[in-house]
């Protein structure tokens, strides 16, 4: 049974005013028809380039914004049925670690105040019990109890992110939303924080929604991956299957974008990346409503891709892919995507 179940979720932001008083800008469809599930104690990665809608989806799960359509369920909670007020029990069950460890910590508060705040508000701890639990959380993330009396500016970026993780773990959450938790850190610090997150999951049994743009990092941390492009989830599946045998052309493009230390391999990857993306740098304009968002960049594009978004179908690896290549194109007979030459194959 799934801990989190997101069904047909859409988030549409209203367009603002144009240059002239009577002009209205079109609505922005940040997320369209998203389906995602996370089991208890499972790590699921949500990957995609900037502007794909992955952070918006995470914020909808956190109740930091209200979805336009669809449902979100967390265990017994019907999240989309809460109305304007969010129950305290849901706040305890779902916590977040933001990308920027500097901006997410109040510089006017000591670490003790930062870590203790959710303990007071949600757990009702006070006095000695509050101090003991705060010190315990600091030890859990590899910091000392004496660090509690310092301010955020006295710590490095990696230490600040550890403090943010300690704060998120204070309520013993069932689900932790990690919004690019290592993107703002240097490489050596990234590995330390990733190892910390893996250890903490084993110790706490919390489920992770790991939002990132680095597929290599997500593969290391997560059991399953969902790939998002320009408001749509285009592929889901086990992490190894997604990375070793992608079923969607955009997933293949992401994998080809991972740097390789071998110059010969890197040249081959660069050539494949350019072919897969048709030389287009990234998604531009508003996401289409009734078309595949990757159609403008896909080397295997067909006429149907411009007129309808494909219904996701099951893959052999146990995931799903939303691509017309698997329903009406050359992969209908089971031909793997890796055999399609983006330079010569006409879908």
Language-model features: locations:
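P-loop NTP-binding/switch modules centered on Walker-like glycine-rich loops
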Residues: 175-177, 181-267
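Short catalytic/signature loops enriched in Gly
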Residues: 2, 15-22, 27, 238-347
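Conserved ABC ATPase "signature" region
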Residues: 77-78, 128-146, 255-256
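Conserved ABC ATPase signature
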Residues: 151-155, 159
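A short, proline-enriched helix->beta-strand linker immediately N-terminal to the Walker B motif
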Residues: 170-174
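Conserved ABC transporter NBD signature motif
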Residues: 70-81
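ABC ATPase NBD coupling module
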Residues: 20-25, 79-95, 113, 121, ...
